[in-house]
Amino acid sequence: MTMWQFKSYFKHHLVFWKDRFLHSSEKQMQRRSILSSVVLIILSFLISFLLIISIPGGRGASFFALFTKLFLDNTNTENFLRQIAIYILAGLAFSFCMSVGIFNIGISGQMMAGAIFGFLMILKVFPSSFRPGFGGQIITVLLMVIGSVSVAVVVATLKIFFKVNEVVSAIMLNWIVVLISAYLVETYIKDNSGGTAQFFSLPLPDEFALYNFSPLTKKFGWLASLIIAFISVIIVAVVLKYTVFGHKLKSIGSSVFGSQAMGFNVRKYQFLSFIISGILSGLLATVVYTASTEKVLTFNNVGDSAISAVPATGFDGIAIGLIALNNPFRIVIVSVLIAFVNIGARPANLNPNTASLVLGIMMYFAALYNLMVYFKPWRYLVKLNIGKINLTTYETYENKLAANLEWLSFQRFLSKQKKKNDKTKFNWFDTSLFEQYAKNKQEIVQEYHHNCATNLIAWWLNAIQSGNIKPSTTFKLEFVNFKHQQKFVLNWFKNESESLRDFQSQFERINKLVEREFVK
């Protein structure tokens, strides 16, 4: 195999993958989904920007500074990267339960349970001489996962076996866990160096904290956090999309009764989804409380010693999961955007409420997703450029392109079977199928172009001959659109001089006839 053959084979593959995404019928919902998500995110930021500059004292420059000033300071940058990991894990913990239709609002409590269990075990139960040279962070992760899963199991048991609404039980457990955690910290592991105004635990030893995970990530807790977060994203995505277990979870989420009719043990899978969500909450606790420089279990975001709230991290995860529509990879994108807003607000000198404003707007636009999925803006562009009369021609064109892709996919499948049976004689980098596909595609495109031009000419000639040309404002607007369609269609034939001259002369003839009718 020569380098030229490899480049040619790779180039054909790229074209195939691009066409498959753009024209394949099986990728139709994916295309619409991506387009809808991008449009909604852009709209949410645009509306946020307009609202900010409309507020007295609001500055548009500060809004754009969210994405620039953040990286001027190393501390802000590290907090930003760690916050991305926190949001990703919180979003995954919520979304995994949502895959079976369960609204897990107890992520904050599960996270706090994991944190208090891990801190108590390491600071009070383990002997002070026990400081492993390597693997202490793994012990921390396991302890916090055990604590988080324990609370998740309680919520799951109440929901599945006692029919207690998971939202009610999780909210109650959130408060119970936070208050018990505060009592345990106050009684056993409180750091009194901060005085009475501040309320936090003793710091976790370096040997157990993600902040000092390894020589590579020493003093870079954000790196270990991102590694954990991205590994979790990949595992969750693979489980949900490529395993029988994942498909059963999504089936139950779509229809509990339908899944029961198929013979699925619904209780079992709902219970397992709670456990996996609890595992993710345990990982979240590890990142939140051991990946920063402080390495303490703090209550400063819930009122310190006067507990007045539960940690907002779990609720951030709910918002992110809803905005991302429970898709693991979208959760990453949304987490980055929200982290930009939350961490970048201070260096950009924006009001602290800006983050909540943008988040609320993004959630509102996320609610419009189902409407956007069925909104087809490109159809309006097609109608504008080739005319309403060619919409059927365009649909036929799309169907033929999809059929051509199906032909190539099937032929490639047969080709792979031949490779298995005859590895010595078969040309592994044969591009003949791709070349035939490209030839078929070119013929389909040429047919589409000629049909569009012919249909436009036929429709206007028929309108002239039947006397339907009226010097009205409506018809004059249609004629203006027709002139735009002429330019658009003729641009297709700029490399086909004969066809270009033919269609150009016919369009000019129609223009003269129509203008003559308008004069009458």
Swiss-Prot record:
What broad class describes the main subcellular location of this protein?
Answer: membrane
Indicate the segments annotated as coiled coil, or none if absent. none
- Compartments, as annotated in UniProt: Cell membrane
Membrane-spanning ranges: 38-58, 84-104, 105-125, 138-158, 167-187, 220-240, 271-291, 318-338, 355-375
- Pfam annotation, one family: BPD_transp_2
| Entry keyword set | Cell membrane, Membrane, Transmembrane, Transmembrane helix
Membrane protein topology class: Multi-pass membrane protein
Keyword Transmembrane helix among record annotations = yes
MF GO annotations: transmembrane transporter activity
Q: Which cellular component appears as one GO term in the record? A: plasma membrane
Q: Does the keyword Transmembrane helix apply?
A: yes
Q: What is this protein called?
A: Uncharacterized protein MG120
Please name the source species.
Mycoplasma genitalium (strain ATCC 33530 / DSM 19775 / NCTC 10195 / G37)
